[in-house]
Amino acid sequence: MNPNQKIITIGSVSLGLVCLDILLHIISITITVLGLHKNGKQRRCNETVIREDNETVRIEKVTQWHNTNVIEYIEKLEGDHFMNNTEPLCHAKGFALFSKDN
């Protein structure tokens, strides 16, 4: 088997496994959706629901937007310094940086 046939065989097997995986996902989603619709008919939960109602207090938050701009000036501190971005962060050495991919 020559190298091209090996590459085509590996690609075909990979593509077949991907198709099988997608098919299994579709089947799993279908079974889940059908199972939820079948079992979702007004069942009572065994949970205890506690509701706290206070009829005397009503809290509302009203937010109104106006066409205003808020500009906040921040003073620059004298102690700030910035990195020199013209130099590399780490000095890489070796031949792998200049090699070809194939």
From Swiss-Prot:
Residue ranges, annotated region (Hypervariable stalk region): 37-88
Glycosylation site residues: N46, N54, N84
Topology with respect to the bilayer: Single-pass type II membrane protein
UniProt note on regulation of activity: Inhibited by the neuraminidase inhibitors zanamivir (Relenza) and oseltamivir (Tamiflu). These drugs interfere with the release of progeny virus from infected cells and are effective against all influenza strains. Resistance to neuraminidase inhibitors is quite rare.
Entry GO CC: host cell plasma membrane; membrane; virion membrane
Enzyme class of the recorded protein, top EC level: hydrolase
Co-factor remark: Binds 1 Ca(2+) ion.
Intravirion side: 1-6
Stretches that traverse the bilayer: 7-35
Entry EC number(s): 3.2.1.18
Necessary cofactors: Ca(2+)
Modifications made to the protein after synthesis: N-glycosylated.
Region named Head of neuraminidase: 89-102
Start and end residues of each stretch annotated as Involved in apical transport and lipid raft association: 11-33
Residues in compartment: Virion surface: 36-102
Notes on the domains: Intact N-terminus is essential for virion morphogenesis. Possesses two apical sorting signals, one in the ectodomain, which is likely to be a glycan, and the other in the transmembrane domain. The transmembrane domain also plays a role in lipid raft association.
Similarity remark: Belongs to the glycosyl hydrolase 34 family.
Quaternary data: Homotetramer.
Protein name per the record: Neuraminidase
Gene name linked to the record: NA
